[in-house]
């Protein structure tokens, strides 16, 4: 599924809200290198690795990143993997609560799944991806590395077989004519639902461990730091791209859906595979991150809704929220980043190491 995960890189920076707020990143290296999450948000990972966290040579980082991308690409090009994803999505179409949507779901899947797969498999370029992450030096773009999607592709992805109302940018729910279906048919909701189901099935921890095994070049001071880096930032990127940008961009291309109902930060700094002793910090950062995108008035409701996330222990989350709600609300609306907020609450260690490894069980 890397051809979908890496869509933001191929589409250019204007296609999605990838970066952290510009004012925060404008603080410079002191802000960028506080954590891996912030380094990724500000596209300063290469700088932090070379200048702050270790003595990595730029060329080595670039090569290591490209190796990681190639491994993930190879994994996702396997026919058995694609068949598994296709069957999974077909099953999701079959179990939709509103059975009237099932035929349209299968139609959308059958028509556009192969189009998206074929295009992005042919467009994966490790060098471009690693430049976007700040791990390869920027240079003059080569003609075949244009990041903008071509007009012919857009023509293929605007659902020409469906009513004209679906072919223009507009509300995120569009209707078929009353003659075809007597109720509104939310194609964009359907698209996002299927992609979120894919998100839930991907074993991010297993992928991260596989990525960590390719580390053999980077000569950082601390032994094993490359494997740690590979494991940790792979999980972070998968969470970020699958959680927000993948639904936005794929559904935006296929259905021209608007981004009005997008919620949550571009980079959710919460891999579910963190070790048990970090669970309180993890929970706090997730809740705080979810609340950070809302107005002060909407923050309490956003904090409570965060506990409904499928991977959280709901009871522990609600207990945490009840215990910390007044102060959490004040800190979350004060413009601090999630980790700083949770340090202030005592949920996260103040001696946080940006390159602290995660512990993932081997399967």
From Swiss-Prot:
Glycans are attached at residue 293. The keyword Ubl conjugation does not apply. One of its GO terms (biological process) is lipid metabolic process. One of its GO terms (cellular component) is alveolar lamellar body. Residues 58-140, 184-261, 277-352 form the Saposin B-type domain. Keywords: Disulfide bond, Gaseous exchange, Glycoprotein, Repeat, Secreted, Signal, Surface film. Residues 18-58 form the Saposin A-type domain. Disulfide bonds join 62-136, 65-130, 93-105, 188-257, 191-251, 215-226, 281-348, 284-342, 307-317. SUPFAM superfamilies: Saposin. It comes from the Eukaryota. SMART domains: SAPA, SapB. Residues 1-16 form the signal peptide. It is found in: Secreted, Extracellular space, Surface film. Gene3D superfamilies: Saposin-like (1.10.225.10). Residues 17-180, 260-363 form a propeptide. Pulmonary surfactant consists of 90% lipid and 10% protein. There are 4 surfactant-associated proteins: 2 collagenous, carbohydrate-binding glycoproteins (SP-A and SP-D) and 2 small hydrophobic proteins (SP-B and SP-C). Homodimer; disulfide-linked. Pulmonary surfactant-associated proteins promote alveolar stability by lowering the surface tension at the air-liquid interface in the peripheral air spaces. SP-B increases the collapse pressure of palmitic acid to nearly 70 millinewtons per meter. This is Pulmonary surfactant-associated protein B. It comes from Canis lupus familiaris (Dog). The gene is SFTPB.
């Amino acid at each position: 599924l890397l051809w979908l995960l890496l869509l933001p890189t191929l589409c250019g920076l204007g296609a999605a809200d990838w970066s952290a707020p510009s004012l925060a990143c404008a603080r410079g290296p002191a802000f960028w290198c506080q954590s891996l999450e912030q380094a990724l948000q500000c596209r300063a990972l290469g700088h932090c690795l070379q200048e702050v966290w270790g003595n990595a040579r730029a060329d080595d980082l670039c090569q290591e990143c490209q190796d990681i991308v190639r491994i993930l690409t190879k994994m996702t090009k396997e026919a058995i993997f694609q068949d598994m994803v296709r069957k999974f999505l077909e099953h999701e179409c079959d179990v939709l609560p509103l059975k009237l949507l099932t035929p349209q779901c299968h139609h959308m899947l059958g028509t556009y799944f192969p189009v998206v797969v074929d295009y992005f498999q042919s467009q994966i370029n490790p060098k471009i991806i690693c430049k976007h992450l700040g791990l390869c030096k920027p240079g003059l773009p080569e003609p075949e590395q244009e990041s903008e999607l071509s007009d012919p592709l857009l023509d293929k992805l605007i659902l020409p077989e469906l009513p004209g109302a679906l072919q223009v940018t507009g509300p995120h729910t569009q209707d078929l004519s009353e003659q075809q279906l007597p109720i509104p048919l939310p194609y964009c909701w359907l698209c996002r639902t299927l992609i979120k189901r894919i998100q839930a099935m991907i074993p991010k921890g297993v992928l991260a461990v596989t990525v960590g095994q390719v580390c053999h070049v980077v000569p950082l001071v601390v032994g094993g730091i490359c494997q740690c880096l590979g494991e940790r930032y792979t999980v972070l990127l998968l969470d970020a791209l699958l959680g927000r940008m993948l639904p936005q961009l794929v559904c935006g291309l296929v259905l021209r859906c608007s981004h009005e109902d997008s919620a949550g930060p571009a980079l959710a700094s919460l891999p579910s595979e963190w070790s048990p002793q970090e669970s309180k910090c993890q929970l706090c950062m997730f809740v705080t991150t979810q609340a950070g995108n809302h107005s002060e008035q909407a923050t309490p409701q956003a904090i409570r809704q965060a506990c409904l996330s499928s991977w959280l222990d709901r009871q522990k989350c609600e207990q945490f929220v009840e215990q910390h709600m007044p102060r959490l609300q004040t800190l979350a609306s004060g413009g601090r980043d999630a980790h700083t907020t949770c340090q202030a609450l005592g949920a996260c260690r103040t001696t946080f190491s940006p390159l602290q490894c995660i512990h993932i069980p081997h399967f």
